[in-house]
Each structure stands twice: as structure tokens, then as C-alpha cells.
């Protein structure tokens, strides 16, 4: 991820080099080294790119953007804040970051175009990053909005017989990890990517829905319906998205031509993600996460009565675990240790489990989050911009939000 943050060369070539060396040195079997190519994340990105092309080429993204642009194009601050707010609101109705990003990124880019931002401009990058991060980071404070949340709930209920209520989870996390982090996101984007909107004149009176748009809306509604009900049918979001993408590519049925697919689907971005996930698989194959879980209790400075130190140690442990296991691995690694941690700190079991949220809502490197890795190629933004934003927001979160969270938890009586 250092390469991503510094923009050193073609990143996918570096990923392929690492994977090639892993095979030549027999560090792991091929199914581990190349697990990224068979992962759901890889195919989520492919399907997301195809769906995004369809939303843009049919004019549906422009149609939706026209509804919102008039309220956002008179102020750059209002534009970026509005995009972030729309992403957060989607988190309350769509329990999948992947679904939110696939739906929202093309619309946000159309809004950026309507505001006069050319591809590659500061404004276009800021809008794309606002849509990607706004749909993802603050929504960790909404109980069913992301996969790590659901893994934490499921493992806590299975192992410890407890799961949080929607309201208490929202009250504990949303004021700081949701609202205040969203404000930080807006401020950082305005600082990193200064620009001003130059609204384009309206294209003319609204046109009626044509057959291609109506067909795309129907496909999207069916896709979203399957995504929203995945707990019932147990079909992965990746295969639902791939089915939709395949349908959109079918001649006579779909809306994405072979020429558009060849020109607009960025293969190198897919290789970057597959490479990063393959490297993560190598780390897991070497059992680094297992070693971390086995020794973490002896490393931590936990002691009853030292509430602030205990809180920071637990939160930072969750954050560091995510760097090794990715975000979804945090609850899988730390939930079994919640009982001993509770005894060592004097915190309630519930409070111990809730500190995981501070960890998986703090993304330090982009490879930790599949939705972010998916969003960047979909938005056409180099990964280094997301990497830089992750590092800045992580620093603000650890130095400002973690201490404020401690005071908030204390005031609510969780500690």
C-alpha cells in the first residue's frame, strides 16, 4: 500500500512481481497466491464496472444527477457535503457498501460533470472520493450497513450470546464515528482538492424515459432486491452482480457494447485488487493473524482501573488487527478474546465487543477495504488518492475521535 500512496510506477506490475516470487519460492500453493482472482471482491469490481458503464451510457446517471445538481452547484462546500450526506443516507436503506457504491458513483460523477468539473480535475476527484468514502466510512456507525458489522454481531451472538440493538449501536457510534468523521472527510477533501463549480447550462426540457433506461432500472431493481435479501437466499453479492453484468453485456438485451467494455473496463485496476488480495491470502497462509490473536493478550497494557489506557489499547489493537487480517478479520480474530479482555480491564463484555467498531471503521491502507478498492476504478480515480485520504483520516480518527469516543462512552455509562 506504500506504493499506492506514493504512486510509484504501475502498481499492478508490483503486485504481479510479488505473486510471481511467491510461486517461484513456493511460499504458498497457487490457490492461495492467486486467490484474489477467484475472490468475490475481484468479481464485484468487474460487475460494478459494467453496471457503472450501463448507468452512465443510458443517460440514467445524468437524469438522476439533474435532480440534485441544482441544489448543490452554487457552493463547492455544499456540493462535497451534499455528496457525503447522500452516501450516509444510503447507508440507512442499503445494507451493502458494494451496492451503494455501484449505484452512487456514476450518479456522483454525473453531478460533477454538471457542475463543470472535467475528468481528472480537483473537483471531479473530490466528488468521486466523497461518494466512495461517504458511502462507506461513516456507515460503519449504522448497525447493518457493512460486512464487518454483521460479522461482529453474528460472532458475538454465537460465542457470547449477545448482540446490540440498532438504537443503542447508533447512539454509541453515530455521533462521532458517523457525523464527526463525515465532517472531517468533507474538510479534508476541501483542503486537498480545492476547486469551484462552474454549472453547465441545462440541456433542455426533461426527456421521457426511453426503453433502454426503463430496462436498466428494472435490472437494477431486481439486482438491488437480491442484494437486500441475501440473508434469505444466501447468494453472494458478487454472483448477483455478475449475473446483472452478464445480462447487461448480452447482445440484444443489454446496454453495454463490446467496444464500451473493452475501452472502459480497466484490467490493470482489477489486477491491482487481485494482487492485494493474493498478498493478504499469503499473510493469512503464514498464520500471522493467528499468531497475533494468540499473543495479543500478553502484549496489551491492560489493567483494571486504567480506563483510558485500556480503551485506547483495545481500539488500537482492533485497528492494527485490520492491517493484518483486513476489516472483516477484526471481529473474527478479536471476538473470541472478548471474555479474557473483559476480565483484564474490568470493562463489560459488551464494551469490549464495541471497541472493535473503532478498529474496523478506521482504514489505514486501502487493501483493507474491498468497497474502496472497488470504488476507485469505478470512479476513474488513481488508488493513491484513496490511500492518502485513508492515512489522513486514520490519523485524525486516532488522535481526535478515539479520545472523544472515550469521553462519550464514559458519559453514556458504557465504561
Residue ranges and their predicted role:
Residues 31-40, 164-175, 208-211, 229-240, ...:
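Interfacial loop-to-helix junctions that mark the boundaries of transmembrane helices
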Residues 72-107, 302-345, 349-358:
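Hydrophobic alpha-helical transmembrane segments of multi-pass integral membrane proteins
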Residues 26-28, 57-60, 70-74, 111-125, ...:
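Juxtamembrane helix-boundary/capping and inter-helix hinge elements in multi-pass membrane proteins
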Residues 1-8, 12:
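Single conserved hydrophobic/aromatic residue that forms the stacking wall/gate
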Amino acid at each position: 500500500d506504500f506504493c499506492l500512496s506514493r504512486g510509484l510506477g504501475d502498481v499492478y506490475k508490483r503486485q504481479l512481481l510479488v505473486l510471481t516470487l511467491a510461486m517461484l519460492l513456493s511460499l504458498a500453493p497457487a490457490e492461495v497466491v492467486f486467490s484474489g482472482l477467484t475472490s468475490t471482491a475481484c468479481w464485484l469490481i468487474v460487475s460494478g464496472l459494467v453496471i457503472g458503464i450501463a448507468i452512465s451510457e443510458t443517460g440514467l446517471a445524468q437524469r438522476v444527477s439533474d435532480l440534485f445538481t441544482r441544489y448543490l452547484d452554487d457552493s463547492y462546500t455544499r456540493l462535497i457535503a451534499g455528496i457525503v450526506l447522500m452516501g450516509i443516507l444510503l447507508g440507512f436503506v442499503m445494507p451493502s457498501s458494494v451496492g451503494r457504491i455501484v449505484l452512487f458513483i456514476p450518479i456522483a460523477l454525473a453531478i460533477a460533470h454538471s457542475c463543470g468539473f472535467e475528468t481528472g480535475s480537483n473537483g471531479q476527484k473530490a466528488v468521486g472520493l466523497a461518494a466512495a468514502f461517504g458511502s462507506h466510512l461513516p456507515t460503519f456507525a449504522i448497525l447493518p450497513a457493512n460486512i464487518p458489522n454483521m460479522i461482529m454481531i453474528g460472532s458475538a451472538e454465537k460465542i457470547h450470546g449477545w448482540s446490540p440493538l440498532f438504537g443503542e449501536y447508533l447512539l454509541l457510534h453515530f455521533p462521532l464515528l458517523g457525523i464527526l468523521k463525515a465532517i472531517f472527510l468533507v474538510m479534508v477533501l476541501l483542503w486537498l482538492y480545492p476547486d469551484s463549480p462552474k454549472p453547465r447550462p441545462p440541456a433542455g426540457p426533461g426527456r421521457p424515459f426511453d426503453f433502454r433506461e426503463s430496462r436498466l432500472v428494472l435490472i437494477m431493481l431486481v439486482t438491488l432486491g437480491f442484494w437486500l435479501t441475501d440473508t434469505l437466499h444466501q447468494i453472494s453479492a458478487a454472483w448477483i452482480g455478475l449475473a446483472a453484468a452478464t445480462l447487461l453485456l448480452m447482445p440484444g438485451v443489454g446496454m453495454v457494447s463490446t467496444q464500451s467494455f473493452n475501452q472502459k473496463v480497466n484490467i490493470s485496476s482489477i489486477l491491482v485488487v487481485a494482487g492485494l488480495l493474493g498478498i493478504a491470502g499469503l499473510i493469512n497462509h503464514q498464520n500471522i493473524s493467528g499468531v497475533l490473536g494468540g499473543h495479543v493478550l500478553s502484549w496489551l497494557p491492560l489493567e483494571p482501573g486504567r480506563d483510558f489506557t485500556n480503551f485506547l489499547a483495545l481500539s488500537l489493537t482492533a485497528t492494527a488487527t485490520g492491517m493484518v487480517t483486513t476489516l472483516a478479520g477484526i471481529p473474527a480474530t478479536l471476538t473470541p478474546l472478548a471474555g479474557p479482555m473483559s476480565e483484564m480491564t474490568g470493562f463489560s463484555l459488551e464494551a469490549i465487543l464495541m471497541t472493535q467498531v473503532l478498529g474496523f471503521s478506521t482504514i489505514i491502507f486501502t487493501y483493507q477495504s474491498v468497497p474502496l478498492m472497488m470504488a476507485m476504478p469505478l470512479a476513474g480515480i488513481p488508488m493513491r488518492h484513496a490511500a492518502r485520504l485513508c492515512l489522513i483520516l486514520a490519523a485524525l480518527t486516532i488522535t481526535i475521535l478515539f479520545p472523544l469516543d472515550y469521553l462519550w462512552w464514559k458519559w453514556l455509562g458504557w465504561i
